[in-house]
């Protein structure tokens, strides 16, 4: 679908430069009134130029911060254990008076999640550890995050593991590379979380949100 691809391209490639660079470019394009636009990246525009520019105009304004303090909790879960942690952390975030947006990365659109992260004040990334690594959907999401856009956001990682649990420290390192504020060593449990683990996950979510 053309518009779905156009939106995906905007979110992952153009979005980080939406203000002021994209807005200035749109203004210049409208002043020049070109019959064709040949960008250095992306499709050539030879029809529907005004429609595309209008869409870009609107999308440039979509990343205004959420009115209430918000934490995006984006996760992938192999056996449901990391999902249980995510749900409890969301409860804890809400206990602290903040909003929690839960995204299962196997179902949610990457562009939608990235856009929500751009508007939120906090981010929790969740993944189990398989073959000593976090799972691909989480890494795919981080490829749409940029220091220029997301630096300074409060962020951490969590997950269930069976053996060595490298997913959480690997994700924390990526969050630091994005120049986000990483306040701790994340949260991880071995295999299926116990009731004590779930209570601790809820408390972790609350403590995290109180730092926003």
Residue ranges and their predicted role:
Residues 1-44, 49-50, 62-63, 70, ...:
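FMN-binding flavodoxin-like domain, especially the glycine-rich phosphate-binding loop
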Residues 53-59:
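Membrane-embedded alpha-helical bundles that constitute the cytochrome b-like, heme-associated redox core
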Residues 75-81:
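N-terminal beta1-alpha1 ligand-phosphate binding loop
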């Amino acid at each position: 679908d053309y518009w779905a691809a156009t939106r995906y391209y905007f979110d992952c490639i153009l979005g980080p430069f939406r203000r002021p660079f994209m807005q200035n470019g749109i203004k210049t394009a409208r002043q020049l009134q070109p019959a064709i636009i040949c960008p250095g990246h992306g499709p050539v525009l030879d029809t529907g130029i005004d429609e595309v520019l209008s869409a870009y105009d609107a999308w440039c304004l979509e990343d205004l911060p959420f009115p209430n303090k918000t934490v995006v909790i984006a996760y992938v879960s192999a056996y449901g254990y990391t999902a249980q942690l995510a749900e409890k952390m969301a409860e804890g975030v809400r206990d602290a008076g903040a909003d929690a947006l839960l995204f299962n990365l196997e179902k949610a659109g990457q562009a939608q999640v990235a856009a929500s992260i751009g508007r939120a004040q906090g981010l929790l990334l969740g993944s189990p550890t398989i073959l000593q690594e976090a799972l691909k959907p989480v890494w795919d999401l981080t490829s749409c995050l940029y220091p220029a856009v997301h630096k300074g956001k409060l962020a951490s990682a969590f997950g269930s593991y069976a053996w060595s649990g490298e997913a959480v420290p690997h994700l924390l390192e990526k969050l630091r590379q994005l120049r986000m504020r990483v306040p701790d060593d994340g949260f991880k449990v071995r295999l299926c979380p116990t009731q004590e683990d779930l209570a601790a996950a809820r408390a972790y979510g609350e403590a995290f949100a109180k730092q926003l």
